[in-house]
């Protein structure tokens, strides 16, 4: 619903002298087209020239690389403060959707903006949607403002000290031009509240606003995906199905999402079936973790589903509200893998060092669907620990083997193949890579390596690590994440004063952006061939 508003913004204001900050950047595509980057949207060969998010390296019209939500007002406050310190007079504009207002940082920014007493224009794009429907008390006030055309005396924005202007026809360019012209060069922090329609102008998007948030390449005429993925399994849907069954067995089981209900497999129909046993808190990861801790403390069985990239937003709550208290909430971490989203703002390979180093947390790394659900079954049932489970990779993998049903005896690795000379500890989704390395060593060096599924990211199986000192010269660790602060470093530290050689394989610490998966794996020597060469060089 931001196409018309973006055109009006660029008509009224003088970008980049006047600075525009787009929240999340999902709303910035029209902005990019109007600032010299339309070729990336029209010519397939230029597609990768431009990212899906605002990016200062692309254009002087972009001021931040942004991909997470609720940040634009705070960033704009900073730009306004810097402008005032330097004696500037340009307009500072933050564009934020109503869905993003559910995030705590948005409230913090609005509260600060209300006392700045200077030019700061906040465009609230209210299309009555987040990714799915909005949740939170604030939206009752937005509805009241829409119903009264902005005239209600109960006005959330005014209560914070912000001036306020309502535009009921938020997809009408003349109305928008008039509103923006009215607030241009204002000396006060001002909210321009525009009521828009999500997907305006494209019938399939208007008809299914939630589904089209995730849409893959599609046929323009029909709106149908070019590749039919309807028959493919995915961990999101499987998790939702599992939890819905648990809810029927136990009325204290609660599924929690933070603005992305389908991450945990709760489609509109499943949300309806779950009733009060499903809670979407809006885009508020911090609150979601604290809520889960509170539910667990009260005797409930909460399961919070979240993408790896968004776990970063709730570190303090994981540490303070959950783990210090030791409450048995469950967190399922999705897309924690190098094979997931590949843009710099949505990387999924920083969660291992972040989560696994918090005391009291049990962080599990299943290797396949069967092991994942065995761990999830135990995690929901147990009452001793906060448990996080790293959902294994992007694609569903199945194994025909028996998996444990009780993980209460912590930090016990599973030796799946006993060998000698080389021991491979292949964590989670990289278990298959460990199997491939084992086969490569047999083929090329005649070494029958030991293969181990560590299962626990958060601790060491010291008896097994001691056992490996007999008959093994090299221990290899494989992890689907950054090495710094990760699983492999714990193993290397354990063997530090011994004769054991330890090779850690994972990703170097960097903000990789729009990478080719195969190229990134090779750059980090994460192929069976490269690792086998390294091992052969040591064995001689």
Segments the model singles out, each with a brief description of its role:
Residues 1-2, 22-26, 55-74, 96-100, ...:
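Active-site nucleophile and cofactor-binding loops and adjacent substrate-binding regions
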Residues 2-116, 253, 258, 267-268, ...:
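Cofactor-binding active-site loop characterized by glycine-rich and histidine/acidic residues
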Residues 19, 202-312, 317-327, 426-428:
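Non-catalytic terminal/interface segments that mediate subunit docking, oligomerization
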Residues 41-50, 115-129, 323-335:
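A glycine-rich helix N-cap at a beta->alpha junction
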Residues 51-65, 87-93, 267-282, 300-302, ...:
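Glycine/charged-rich beta-loop-alpha catalytic/anionic-binding loops adjacent to active sites
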Residues 62-218, 224-232, 236-241, 361-472:
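Glycine-rich ThDP/TPP pyrophosphate-binding loop and its adjacent helix/strand module
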Residues 104, 168-184, 271-300, 304-321, ...:
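Glycine-rich, anion-gripping cofactor-binding loops and their flanking helix/strand elements
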Residues 223-229, 340-342, 362, 482, ...:
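Peripheral docking tails and interdomain loops at the edges
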């Amino acid at each position: 619903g931001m196409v018309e508003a973006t055109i009006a913004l660029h008509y009224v204001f003088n970008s980049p002298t006047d600075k525009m900050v787009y929240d999340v950047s999902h709303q910035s595509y029209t902005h990019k087209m109007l600032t010299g980057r339309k070729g990336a949207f029209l010519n397939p060969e230029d597609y990768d020239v431009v990212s899906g998010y605002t990016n200062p390296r692309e254009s002087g019209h972009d001021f931040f690389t942004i991909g997470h939500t609720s940040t634009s007002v705070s960033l704009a406050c900073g730009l306004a403060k810097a402008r005032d310190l330097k004696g500037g007079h340009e307009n500072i504009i933050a564009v934020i959707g109503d869905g993003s207002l559910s995030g705590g940082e948005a409230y913090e920014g609005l509260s600060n903006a209300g006392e700045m007493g200077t030019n700061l224009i906040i465009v609230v794009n209210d299309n009555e949607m987040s990714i799915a429907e909005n949740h939170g008390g604030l939206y009752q006030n937005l509805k009241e403002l829409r119903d009264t055309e902005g005239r209600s005396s109960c006005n959330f924005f005014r209560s914070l000290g912000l001036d306020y202007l309502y535009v009921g026809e938020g997809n009408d360019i003349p109305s928008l031009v008039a509103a923006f012209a009215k607030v241009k060069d204002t000396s006060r922090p001002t909210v321009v509240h525009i009521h828009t329609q999500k997907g305006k102008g494209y019938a399939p998007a208007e008809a299914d606003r939630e589904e089209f948030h995730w849409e893959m390449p599609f046929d323009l005429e029909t709106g149908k995906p070019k590749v039919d993925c309807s028959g493919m399994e995915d961990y999101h849907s499987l998790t939702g199905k599992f939890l819905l069954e648990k809810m029927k067995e136990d009325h204290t089981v609660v599924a929690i999402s933070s603005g992305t209900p389908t991450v945990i497999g709760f489609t509109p129909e499943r949300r309806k079936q779950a009733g009060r046993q499903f809670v979407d808190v809006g885009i508020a990861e911090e609150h979601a973790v604290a809520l889960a801790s509170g539910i667990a403390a009260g005797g409930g069985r909460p399961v919070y589903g979240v993408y790896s990239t968004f776990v970063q937003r709730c570190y303090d709550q994981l540490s303070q509200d959950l783990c210090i208290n030791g409450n048995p909430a469950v967190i399922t971490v999705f897309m924690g893998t190098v094979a997931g989203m590949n843009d710099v703002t949505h990387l999924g390979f920083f969660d291992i060092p972040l989560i696994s180093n918090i005391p009291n947390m049990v962080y599990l790394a299943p290797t396949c669907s069967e092991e994942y659900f065995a761990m999830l079954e135990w995690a929901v049932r147990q009452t001793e620990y906060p448990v996080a489970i790293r959902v294994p990779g992007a694609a569903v993998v199945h194994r025909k083997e028996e998996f444990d049903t009780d993980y209460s005896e912590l930090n016990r690795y599973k030796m799946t193949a006993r060998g000698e000379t080389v021991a491979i500890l292949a964590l989670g989704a990289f278990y298959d890579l460990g199997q491939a390395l084992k086969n490569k060593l047999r083929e090329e060096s005649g070494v029958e390596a030991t293969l181990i599924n560590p299962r626990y990211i958060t601790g060491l199986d010291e008896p097994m690590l001691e056992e490996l000192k007999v008959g093994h010269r090299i221990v290899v660790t494989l992890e689907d994440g950054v090495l710094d602060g990760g699983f492999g470093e714990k193993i290397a530290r354990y063997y530090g004063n011994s004769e054991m050689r330890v090779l850690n394989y994972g990703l170097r610490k960097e903000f990789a952006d729009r990478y080719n998966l195969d190229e990134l794996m090779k750059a980090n020597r994460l192929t069976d061939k490269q690792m086998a060469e390294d091992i052969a060089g040591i064995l001689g």
